[in-house]
Amino acid sequence: AHQRPMQAGHVQDRSPSPDQSFARPEQQGGEDIDKPVRPDWFLQLNTYGGKCAFQLETSQTKDGWYTVNIESAPRENPNDPSNKRYLWNKKTVLQMTKSELPILTAVLLGLLPSARFDNHGQNFKCLEVINQGKNFFFKTSGSGLIMHVAPVPTVDAFLYGSMALTQYARNFNGLSTESAMDVISRLANQLFDQGGYKPAEVRK
């Protein structure tokens, strides 16, 4: 049976993860300090499905490299249509490395058919993305972690790809997103021809 694509993604203002280091304003009398001070380039996109949700947001590595985080979380009760809550306290988070970011961008923008990003952190977290034509297949997993699997609408995937492309270009002063797209396209062609990247594992 075919999986129903997830609902269209949209920007959601959700407080960042504990492992994100956005500065918080000093508390003043009676003021609400729940919302962190985010950089002007911060963007967060979400896609919600029947069993889990996926989210991409802009981030920076400890070395200051502009990249994206991929987060996934299970739905609290998939059998209750009225329950729209997702358990972000049980989420899986992966931050794309300097070398992974252009490959993820290539997959999300239709330049590579799939990719696998693994061995992240102590739990050996893994992200797989496959362009299936009608939609994109997303999967996160890891040692001792809940596996999150869902189809993501093509429109959402291209929104994610545009975010990743913009972050990639931001690392190179004066590089336009158009030029960055040309670089990533050339990279994707060579990686595909020479087998220089990890494709997603074949689903059985």
Residues covered by each model-derived region:
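Positively charged, low-complexity terminal tracts
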Residues: 1-204
